[in-house]
Amino acid sequence: DNDGLPDDWEIENGRDPFKADYMVSSGNYNTCALDDTGAVCWGSQGDAETSIPSSLNNPFQISTGGGNTCALDDTGLTCWESDGGNQSLVSSTSPSSLINPLQVSLGLGHACVLDDSGIQCWGHQGDGRSTVPDSLINPTQVSSGDYHACALDDTGVVCWGYDGEGQTSVPDSLSNATQVSSGRLHTCALDDSGVVCWGSDSYGQTTVPSTLSNPTQVSSGGYHTCALDDTGVV
């Protein structure tokens, strides 16, 4: 569930290893976090960023992106605008046919959800970012970038949407990928060799430092990338 807590510890302490206990998600206008009390959001443009729907009930996953925030809770999926309406396609058209949603990931004006039926995406359709490939086989993770999205399935990493910087062109060298993270114009994955990144390198965001030691998690931002390794360095 990528919350940084060992799965065996979570099981021993009565927590669900498939649901994140603590997490932080930063979008263009706001940041949201989950803690023991629920969801907390803050931002730079007043109530639009910090207001959380009162209907949320035990949220276990949250994602911010563009001008929207979405959360998964005991009742399913809830999305709301956080920039005054510039990206309303996500909050106004979220699907109602989800089956046990497990993960939500927001991009720039689009969103994707992983549920028991596979992956559903909606919102802006530019460059095919919301068109999920029929070829996906048993997907286990989805990550939305600004203009593209990627998923992890039985075949490895699959990406779709805008490929102007090569961010959806998955390297053939990837081996047994365990995580994928989509940024603005680049993508990174965690595999047997460590962290592998592709796409735009305009600010060095795909140049992986040689000092990484046994990385366990990677996160792609707009023009940067961060990783967690066994030294605790990000």
Model regions and ranges:
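A short beta-strand motif characteristic of beta-propeller blades
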Residues: 50-52, 90-94, 128-132, 166-170, ...
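Asparagine/serine/threonine-enriched low-complexity, disordered tracts
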Residues: 30, 58, 68, 99-100, ...
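Proline-centered structural pivot motif
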Residues: 1, 8-23, 53, 95, ...
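Low-complexity/repetitive intrinsically disordered segments
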Residues: 1, 223-234
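Beta-strand-rich domains and repeat architectures in extracellular enzymes and scaffolds
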Residues: 22-31
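Conserved core positions of repeat-based scaffolds
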Residues: 30-33, 41, 68-71, 79, ...
